[in-house]
């Protein structure tokens, strides 16, 4: 199985300006992400940046990068342009690794690519992990996933699903986790390049805007999303200055990462 990793990177960030170029132990964050991705089985790792500064930073460190438009409304649109620029065949598998995940597990990248390859009927693949904290289950920033018997996604939500009716009283939030353990969605996606190109032309789903979850567009239009359930908790991403300091501390303690 051959696949390509695409790393979309956008310079503007409300909470952390110039995030892709933030220094982590002497390297820009987006370069850290690309280097982690290159430890997977990917045949190619390409950063899709929206600013020449990103492309130049990657070039200085031997990372392949392309310049994409700045006016894309979503990451999916940026991926579609990247697929066109790279001339990828419609059947080619790509894995979208977020540019703010410098601790991404290379094995998780391989698993997401394999999940799509093993499910030819699926348009996308992604990953999930068991939730072991009630606080996480109730946290709207932790996206939950519910799967069918074949491991395909039924729904993603910021709400605590599945709702444990017998574990709550009078509609109040449950005091313990439901069993079996609910699943936390991990924001990594596998696609076939042809689907990436067509995705931006799909009408946005009403629930997509309500939940602010773009993957719901695929489900709303009847496409299957195969889900790999990982038994390894995902590494922390970087959204805020505090997140950045935590990740810097990890690399400072383990420079060989």
From Swiss-Prot:
SUPFAM superfamilies assigned: Nucleotide-diphospho-sugar transferases
Q: Which domain of life is it from?
A: Bacteria
- What GO molecular function terms would the record report? 3-deoxy-manno-octulosonate cytidylyltransferase activity
Keyword Nucleus assigned: no
Per the UniProt record, one Pfam family is CTP_transf_3
GO cellular component terms given for this protein = cytosol
What GO terms describe the biological role, i.e. biological process, of this protein?
CMP-keto-3-deoxy-D-manno-octulosonic acid biosynthetic process; lipopolysaccharide biosynthetic process
State the top-level EC class: transferase
The biological pathway it contributes to is: Nucleotide-sugar biosynthesis; CMP-3-deoxy-D-manno-octulosonate biosynthesis; CMP-3-deoxy-D-manno-octulosonate from 3-deoxy-D-manno-octulosonate and CTP: step 1/1; Bacterial outer membrane biogenesis; lipopolysaccharide biosynthesis
The EC number of this protein is 2.7.7.38
Sorted keywords for this record are: Cytoplasm, Lipopolysaccharide biosynthesis, Nucleotidyltransferase, Transferase
Question: Where does it reside?
Answer: Cytoplasm
Is Cell wall biogenesis/degradation found in the keyword set?
no
Task: Report which reactions are catalysed by this protein.
Answer: 3-deoxy-alpha-D-manno-oct-2-ulosonate + CTP = CMP-3-deoxy-beta-D-manno-octulosonate + diphosphate
| Annotated function | Activates KDO (a required 8-carbon sugar) for incorporation into bacterial lipopolysaccharide in Gram-negative bacteria.
Instruction: Give the family from UniProt.
Output: Belongs to the KdsB family.
**What NCBIfam families does the record tag this protein with?**
kdsB, PRK05450.1-5, PRK13368.1
> What is the protein named?
3-deoxy-manno-octulosonate cytidylyltransferase
Source organism (scientific name):
Variovorax paradoxus (strain S110)
């Amino acid at each position: 199985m051959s696949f390509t990793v695409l790393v979309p990177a956008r310079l503007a960030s409300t909470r952390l300006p110039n995030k892709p170029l933030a220094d982590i132990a002497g390297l820009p964050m987006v370069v850290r992400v690309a280097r982690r991705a290159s430890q997977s089985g990917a045949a190619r790792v390409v950063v899709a940046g929206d600013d020449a500064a990103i492309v130049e930073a990657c070039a200085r460190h031997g990372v392949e990068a392309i310049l994409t438009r700045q006016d894309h409304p979503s990451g999916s649109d940026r991926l579609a342009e990247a697929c066109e620029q790279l001339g990828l065949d419609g059947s080619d598998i790509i894995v979208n690794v977020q540019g703010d995940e410098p601790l991404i597990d290379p094995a998780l990248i391989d698993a997401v690519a394999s999940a799509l390859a093993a499910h030819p009927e699926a348009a996308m693949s992604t990953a999930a992990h068991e939730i072991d904290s009630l606080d996480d289950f109730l946290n709207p920033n932790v996206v939950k996933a519910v799967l069918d018997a074949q491991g395909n996604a039924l729904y993603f939500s910021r709400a605590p699903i599945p709702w444990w009716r017998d574990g709550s009283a009078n509609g109040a939030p449950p005091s313990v986790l439901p069993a079996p353990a609910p699943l936390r969605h991990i924001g990594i996606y596998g696609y076939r390049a042809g689907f990436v190109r067509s995705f931006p032309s799909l009408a946005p789903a009403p629930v997509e805007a309500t939940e602010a979850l773009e993957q719901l567009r695929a489900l709303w239009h009847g496409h299957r999303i195969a889900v790999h359930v990982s038994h390894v908790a995902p590494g922390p991403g970087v959204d805020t200055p505090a997140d950045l300091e935590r990740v810097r501390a990890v690399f400072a303690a383990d420079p060989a990462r």
